[in-house]
């Protein structure tokens, strides 16, 4: 779209704005009536580790979103010579989970406890037993119950507990609501009713009844909403809070606030049943939209939902490309020592493509990329390891193939539960992140690892801020009865270029051989962690 059309869309209020709080960056994306980005803004921020808790202050949150909005407004002014006064629709998203408890006066009772905190182990275990459902430590209900078990004073004064994006939305609209994708990161969801699981709500209320709190669980959680539902409008107070210059007008329709997993699914068009996406960078996770509930809970699998309320299984691994990148840097140092100019893109491309020349089973080589602990395989700490036998075929191609395979090893442990024990079917996966930057390499290896076609979009996309802008657009632009899946297929991604690679039988067989060695070799990783060398 040209500048003139974009300007016309802004003046006619045929735009949608999305703002997402990532862990290190707050990003704003403004889209036009074709759902394409026409302006953006950003603000860098960092979490703090205070009194044993990973947190962001309320001041960080508000100065951050204000600066991000101003940066986007400046972009609009620079590109189109317009002072931004309104948008057609607006949505806020953020890192999921965590714990923000407020009292009746709207005061935060303890500092925001983010998803990064692993301080709710006891509560997580007890709730999993009570509900017969996996309750990860970062979920809001685990934080609440741990605070109760700890005897924390603030619990008796709670009037509202919420997540980051629902907190911001509450202050902008006055509405205590949350998109179902992150509502599912607070408390288990009954997908047949698109609401919290009432049987489990009752069990929790019964569990904490002896403490004599004045509240019941449902009263203090945000109402769960699905994509496209009315979530209120930007109030006068909210407009002033967001735009400190006072130019932004109130009354803008707002979509349900949503978590970053949900916006990531939207931005990769992975919201339909039997589709999924794999994000592979420093960490790696797969999210697969399920046809039905799993037969039982698994500690390795997190259950969330799409913004429409379809059940999603998430297999998350803490470790992916850090060790691989470290090896690539060793080759960079070698090249520089030989007096060569090193282009990092060319170096990555050369080494990644070399991997495709390796034996499908990596010639008997084995690697663990555990920079940190890995819950999928039961490690609190990690040690990056490369191991081989004297008989292994040790060459550059097999070495690189091994280092790429192991990036997906821990995630595959979780996926095995879904594919083998639960018979989950996937028609298409979409890959995004650094592992897929070199055309056709990470993509082929993932296809072989999961034995399913893998697509990669020609453009990396705009990420979660674009995803929440699309959810805002869906709120105001959907036809009567139009599903989110249909809206994305027909009005957002219809012309999106992508390439798809099918799994190769020899690659699938080779990855399975590698995984057999990977599982058998975990005792080597255990010995490295328990040794007193590092």
Feature roles, as predicted:
Residues 77-114, 134-136, 169-181, 185-190, ...:
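Short beta-strand-loop/turn "lid" adjacent to the catalytic site in phosphate-handling enzymes
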Residues 39-40, 110, 178, 313:
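A sequence-level detector of short linear motifs
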Residues 3-11, 17-18, 121-178, 187-214, ...:
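Active-site core segments that coordinate phosphate-bearing ligands/cofactors
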């Amino acid at each position: 779209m040209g500048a003139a059309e974009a300007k016309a869309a802004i003046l006619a209020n045929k735009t949608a704005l999305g703002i997402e709080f990532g862990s290190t960056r707050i990003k704003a994306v403004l889209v036009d009536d074709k759902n394409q980005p026409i302006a953006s803004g950003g603000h860098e921020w960092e979490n703090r580790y205070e009194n044993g808790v990973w947190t962001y202050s309320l001041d960080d949150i508000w100065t951050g979103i204000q600066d991000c909005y101003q940066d986007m407004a400046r972009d609009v002014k620079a590109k189109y010579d317009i002072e931004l006064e309104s948008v057609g629709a607006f949505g806020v998203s953020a890192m999921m989970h965590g714990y923000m408890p407020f009292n009746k006066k709207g005061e935060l009772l303890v500092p925001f406890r983010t998803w990064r905190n692993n301080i709710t182990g006891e509560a997580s275990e007890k709730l999993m037993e009570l509900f017969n459902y996996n309750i990860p430590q970062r979920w809001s209900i685990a934080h609440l119950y741990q605070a109760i078990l700890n005897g924390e004073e603030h619990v008796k004064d709670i009037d509202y507990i919420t997540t980051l994006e629902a907190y911001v939305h509450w202050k902008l609209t006055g509405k205590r609501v949350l998109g179902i994708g992150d509502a599912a990161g607070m408390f288990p969801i009954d997908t047949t009713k698109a609401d919290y699981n009432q049987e489990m709500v009752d069990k929790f209320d019964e569990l904490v009844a002896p403490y004599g709190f004045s509240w019941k669980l449902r009263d203090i959680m945000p109402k769960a909403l699905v994509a496209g539902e009315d979530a209120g409008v930007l109030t006068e107070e909210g407009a002033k809070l967001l735009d400190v210059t006072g130019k932004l007008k109130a009354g803008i329709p707002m979509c349900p606030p949503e978590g970053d997993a949900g916006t990531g699914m939207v931005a990769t068009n992975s919201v339909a049943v039997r589709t999924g996406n794999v994000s592979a960078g420093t960490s790696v996770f797969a999210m697969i939209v399920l046809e039905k509930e799993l037969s039982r809970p698994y500690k390795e699998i997190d259950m969330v939902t799409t913004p429409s309320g379809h059940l999603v299984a998430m297999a998350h691994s803490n470790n992916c490309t850090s060790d691989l990148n470290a090896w690539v840097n060793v080759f960079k140092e070698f090249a520089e020592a030989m007096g060569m100019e090193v282009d990092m893109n060319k170096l990555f491309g050369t080494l990644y493509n070399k991997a495709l020349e390796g034996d499908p089973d990596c010639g008997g080589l084995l690697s663990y990329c555990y920079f940190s602990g890995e819950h999928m395989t039961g490690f609190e700490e990690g040690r990056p390891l490369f191991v081989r036998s004297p008989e292994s075929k040790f060459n550059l191609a097999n070495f690189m193939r091994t280092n790429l395979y192991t990036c997906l090893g821990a995630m595959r442990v979780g996926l095995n539960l879904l594919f083998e024990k639960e018979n989950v079917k996937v028609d298409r996966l979409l890959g995004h992140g650094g592992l897929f930057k070199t055309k056709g390499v990470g993509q082929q290896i993932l296809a072989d690892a999961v034995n399913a076609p893998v697509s990669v979009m020609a453009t990396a996309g705009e990420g979660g801020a674009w995803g929440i802008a699309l959810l805002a657009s869906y709120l105001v632009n959907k036809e009567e009865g139009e599903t989110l899946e249909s809206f994305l297929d027909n009005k957002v991604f219809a012309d999106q270029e992508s390439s798809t690679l099918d799994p190769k039988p020899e690659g699938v067989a080779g990855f399975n051989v590698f995984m057999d060695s990977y599982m058998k070799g975990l005792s080597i990783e255990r010995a490295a962690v328990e040794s007193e060398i590092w």
